[in-house]
Amino acid sequence: IIWIGTDGQGVFAYTKDAYTFCNITLNQLPIKKKRPVRAIQTDKDENLWLGTKDNGVICIKNYRMAKEYSSSNVIQYTMQDGLANNSVFAFSLSRKNILWICSDGPGISYYSYDDQKIHRISDARYVHTIYEASDSVLWVGADKGLLKLSVEWKGNKPIVKDSKAFLSEVRGKRFDIQIYSMYAENDSILWLGTRGSGAFRFNMYTGSYQNIRFNKVGIPPIDDILCILKDSKQRLWFGSSYGLTRLDSYQKDSVSFTSYSENKGLPNNTIHGMKEDSRGNLWLSSNTGIIQFNPDSEVFRQYNYKTGLDVFEFSDNAYYQSPFTGSIFFGGINGVVWLQEDSITENKMVPE
């Protein structure tokens, strides 16, 4: 405990560590193949869903209370169970009673909480990210651009009625845009992160867009956008294969930004995932551990095997923040780690 004295305002006691890290390694699970975790999701039933590269979906029941892992609380789903593909890159909880599952292709499946089975819905290929704008519209990021899927429902069973492609042409030229990340800024603006083509600010109502490039500094990997976040102070952040970028302003013909790389104290340049905690810190997953970044003080701190993490080399797409607990999850080559903010003990004693 750290005791802090004030001038006439009493004494405050704060616990030393504000965060707790939890690990689950693939070696702890009753599965034969050990493949990198590429997607993460939790649900209201305390299930932890892990999408893997080439080993299907792993569901850990009551994950926060589990002490051991066996076939009684770990279920694996593969193509034999209805998955479209065993390489799973994204999850999204639907407004309906299903879980969307996106994979290498042919593309999209869903898990029904009603019948507890996996079903296929679309042949979209190489789907890395998905956003359910409403119960009738899905936006899907794939290797050939952006897809808008129009969905109808029979009860809790979805049916794709129409598919429309966007961003297949940029500046009048045929362009194969590989979309890796999405961030919904509001109900009309969707930010898209691409492999090598920068970021796109896309209007879901009009179909108009602005392509924002950061490689004016002569470093092409900075346009390899792996994750996007708008923080609580309305600052837009982009994680890439060459560090962290803050978008300061953007006009039609001009972009102003601030970049952070290993040259500026960032512990590792590859930023796979990014989330913000309630204190305004950004948490970044990298090739060498988890990085805590204070955007105001511009101070970095790294967590890895030296600080007790069993998972410290992370994967693209594998980042998630639970709306149920606030915990931040990152998936890696040998498992998953999550951090939860501990309640800071405030013991205020005011002298008489």
Where do the language-model regions lie?
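Carboxylate-rich, polar loop motifs that coordinate divalent cations or form catalytic acidic clusters
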Residues: 1-352
